A protein has these predicted regions:
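Residues that define the transmembrane beta-barrel architecture of outer-membrane proteins
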Residues: 27-29, 53-59, 96-102, 121, ...
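Outer-membrane beta-barrel "beta-signal"
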Residues: 30-32, 103-109, 179-191
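Outer-membrane beta-barrel biogenesis signature
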Residues: 4-35, 118, 155
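Short glycine/proline- and aromatic-enriched beta-strand/turn motifs that initiate or cap beta-hairpins
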Residues: 20-65, 190
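Transmembrane beta-barrel domains of outer membrane proteins
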Residues: 62-64, 107-111, 146-150, 188-190
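Predominantly the C-terminal beta-signal and adjacent terminal strand-loop region
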Residues: 21, 42, 73-87, 149-191
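Gram-negative (and chloroplast) outer-membrane scaffold detector with strong preference
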Residues: 65-141, 153-155
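Transmembrane beta-barrel strands of outer-membrane/channel proteins
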Residues: 31-39, 75-79, 104, 125-131, ...
Length: 191
């Protein structure tokens, strides 16, 4: 009986430590900073015209809070710009424009369900709302996803690739402030 209890405890501790290794902890904070590119497609298909890109002062930063093993909330700010003689939604620009956005997204981390043995990889889907400004101001519904590669065993330093589609609420009357995609490459630090 003692051997059975000892084996049961050993298995229990092993499973518990494995689960902790592969899941995000509650109450964790993360800070990320990096670059972004904007694909200003407007209402056009991203597969038919993926050529309208903005990459001028491409700074992005975010703070993320995990309230459970699989859910987090992220607040981000993004700066970018469009230079003269480039296009937004098929319209050539006659002057430079600055892009700024503030986004609040909920993230669902599901990578551990697909790759349970890869503790250095996290996959997420995100959805939320955003505020952005180019020539006018608009509000967007955000939908996207990404992947996070942890670069150390403690999972305190990583690299994230993330894409978010921003769908403008008032897009028929918005001019340049219309539907677009944001692509991010960020360094992530656990606080």
């Amino acid at each position: 009986m003692k051997k059975f209890i000892l084996i049961a405890l050993l298995v229990s501790f092993s499973i518990s430590s494995f689960a902790q290794r592969n899941s995000r902890a509650n109450d964790d904070w993360y800070l990320s900073i990096g670059v972004n590119a904007i694909n200003s497609l407007g209402t056009r298909s991203p597969f038919n015209s993926p050529s309208d890109w903005a990459f001028d002062l491409p700074i992005s930063a975010a703070a993320e809070y995990n309230w459970s093993d699989t859910f987090a909330i992220e607040q981000s700010v993004t700066f970018n710009g469009f230079t003269e003689d480039t296009e937004i939604d098929g319209t050539e620009l006659s002057k430079d424009y600055t892009y700024i956005s503030f986004d609040t997204n909920v993230k669902y981390y599901f990578g551990q369900f697909i790759f349970p043995n890869l503790d250095w990889l996290e996959i997420h889907a995100n959805a939320g709302v955003g505020f952005f400004h180019i020539d006018e101001t608009n509000i967007s519904a955000n939908l996207g996803g990404g992947v996070l590669f942890w670069l150390n065993a403690n999972r305190t330093f990583g690299l994230r690739l993330q894409t978010t589609g921003k769908f403008a609420f008032n897009h028929p009357e918005s001019g340049f402030d219309n539907n677009h995609f944001q692509h991010h490459l960020q360094v992530v630090f656990k606080l």
